[in-house]
Structures are given as C-alpha cells and as structure tokens.
Amino acid sequence: MTDQSTFDPGLPDSVRVLAGPGQGEMTEQRSRFLAFAFPAPDETAAREAIAGVARRYHDARHACSAWRLGHGLLPHEHRNDDGEPSGTAGEPLLAAIRKRELTDCVVVVVRYFGGVKLGTGGL
C-alpha cells in the first residue's frame, strides 16, 4: 500500500539528465553552427556555461541558448534568441530539450554568418 502522505504526483519517479557535456557542428548555406550541451544543476551553472561559450566564440554573430532546470510539473525554463528574429532560435532549442524530456541542462548554439540570410524557419 502506498503512503499517500508522502506521494507527490508532481515529482517523476526518474528524470533524464545529461551524463556530461556534448557538442556538434553543422553548416547550412555557408553559415556555421556550433552546438554545445552542458549539465546544469542550477541557473548559475547554466548562465556560466552560456557565458563561457560566448567568451570562447566571441567573434560569432550569435550565441543562442535555452535551459530547463528542476523537476516536477513546472521546471524553470529560459530561452534567448541573442539577436536572431524573435522566437526563431531559443524556442526551438527549448523545444528540443522538452522533446527529449531532459532537465538540468543548458544548450548553446553559436552561429558564424556565411553571407546568406536563412529566413526564420528553425534557426
């Protein structure tokens, strides 16, 4: 029998977190995208990861980001388009994090502009 006094339906039995940092790269119409994912147990760690990538790739046109922290029904989420058209970079990053049901992580994508405007679909 379950002790109802300690049961919290807002807390999952398990959560999905990154085992460690990861990165990837792609080129789209001469624009170069570098993606980084980091475990982030709190907002301070997430902000430090973003700042670290932005410092390292200071010559990139943009450093878009998103994070999802915490567990339960209302995790703390944040996204930043960093100068890309509103909703075209940070929100798709956050959607990818949600789709994979990850938490306590931050994703940063830097873009080196290749001279061709890509439009607003899925930057």
Please annotate each region the language model reported.
Residues 1-87:
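C-terminal regulatory domains involved in ligand/effector binding and gene-expression control
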Residues 54, 97-102:
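Signal for well-folded cores of large energy- and translation-related assemblies
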Residues 72, 79, 103-104, 110:
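Hydrophobic alpha-helical segments and their boundary regions
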Residues 86, 90-96, 123:
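Conserved mixed alpha/beta catalytic, RNA-binding, or beta-rich assembly cores of soluble enzyme
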Residues 105-110, 115-123:
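Glycine- and Gly-Pro-enriched alpha-helical subdomains that act as flexible
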